[in-house]
Amino acid sequence: TEVIKIDFDIGSRAEVLAADNRLSWGYWLKHHCRCLWGNDLSTRFDRFKPSRDIAIAVNGDFASVLTRYADLIEQAVTPTQSLRLQREASRKLIRSTQVLRSEQDLMWPQTLEEHVELFVQHFPCMRMQACFFLSQARSPDAEPKEFTAHLRSFLLWMASEVV
């Protein structure tokens, strides 16, 4: 197995193992993390069936996080900074579309393309918007004002659908 990316999600052992965090930390450890050293806490959890509850536990912060990204992009000092933030925001937005998943969806999307494909199956009218963010996640090139307008519009739509 090749390790292609290392991220750090900071949390205490008690927080990770708390029953209230089973759908967030438990899911994340079981399905997305590989222990490189120390106690492998993922062994404490059974595999999780795909569900909207887990999507909300993991991405329920999408409105505040994406609003913060929009603000940071508008305040960016350099084009490099803005493009980096646009890429990050696009990736978060695409993954956050899981909060709209159907309980009948039987798979966890792994790639950004799979996230978009699943999303568009349920919301075909949003294909163009989803494809815009997929292109920005891969190779950001939109002007900051254009990007934040798209981001804020998609965010409002998503928030109205989550109810």
Regions found by a protein language model. Name each.
Residues L41, D46-V163:
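Conserved nucleotidyltransferase catalytic core and NTase-mimicking acidic/glycine-rich helix/loop elements
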Residues T1-W37, S64-L66, L72:
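Conserved catalytic core of two-metal-ion nucleotidyltransferases
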